[in-house]
Amino acid sequence: MNKSWLAIIFLIISNQAMTQTSHFEPQQPLQGSGAINIVVSNLDEKEGDTYFAEAEKNERNGELNEAVTLFGKAAFEYNSSKQLARYGEALMRLSNVHYQLAHFVEAEQVVLNVALKNYSKMGSRNGQMESYSQLGRIYLALNKPTQSLWFYTQQGILAKQIGNNSAFIESVLGMANVKIRKKEYSLAAKDLNRAEVLAKSANIHEFKNQIKDARSMLPAIAAAKPAKKSSKKK
């Protein structure tokens, strides 16, 4: 496991714990401390933005190990300045880079132990939905189909609740891929047909290639679309 990543996550979790315990400690009021806190918070946020931008640049250039370090630093700075939305975004990007590096356990831990808790604390259903989607992908890569299917199902439930058609179709596709892995080809074909119908009715074209690629992994019989019933009478 990447030592720099471990150090960053330890610092983030430690900072969260210090923030929580500070509520129970009696503190003496310091004159002018409010202005100092605002300045420090703004500096932390700006540092976070700088790290985040550099991390994106490294990711685009394929320098993924550097991107891991910088997204971790950005997450730490955003957490310090209580920019929870940006904190969550940095964590999700950190997890995604780990995923690209095939560091699936690290990718899982960032989302499961940190990002998902952050989004739950915020009450962000979009953030939770994104976390479920990422965990679905990660567990499929880890060959844990039961967990993967559960998280894709949770993504679909939230997507339906908030009316996000793209995320719902993505969850159906995720479930289809899990069923392909489990060799449940008939069930997978039904999910792919459902995803295709939903995408067409919502006029969403981004999943066309994904559906095509998933169908290519099905045996010929399972991949065949159901024939339309003839309306002609004998």
Task: Walk through the language-model features, giving the residues of each.
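Intrinsically disordered, low-complexity regions
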Residues: 1-234
